[in-house]
Swiss-Prot record:
This is Cliotide T15. One of its GO terms (biological process) is defense response to bacterium. It comes from the Eukaryota. The keyword S-adenosyl-L-methionine does not apply. Expressed in root nodules but not in seed. Keywords: Antibiotic, Antimicrobial, Disulfide bond, Knottin, Plant defense. Belongs to the cyclotide family. Moebius subfamily. It comes from Clitoria ternatea (Butterfly pea). Pfam families: Cyclotide (PF03784). Disulfide bonds join C5-C19, C9-C21, C14-C26. There is a cross-link at G1-N29 (Cyclopeptide (Gly-Asn)). Probably participates in a plant defense mechanism. Active against Gram-negative bacterium E.coli ATCC 700926 (MIC=0.5 uM) under low-salt conditions. Not active against Gram-positive bacterium S.aureus ATCC 12600 up to a concentration of 100 uM under low-salt conditions. InterPro entries: Cyclotide, Cyclotide_sf.
Length: 29
């Protein structure tokens, strides 16, 4: 399935694979 990217960025990192930081939350790449 597709990654769920709802977590808050840690600095500029997202821990979920396939997600990138769109501050303050992570978005799917």
């Amino acid at each position: 399935g597709l990654p769920i990217c709802g977590e808050t960025c840690f600095k500029t990192k997202c821990y979920t694979k396939g997600c990138s930081c769109s501050y303050p939350v992570c978005k799917r790449n």
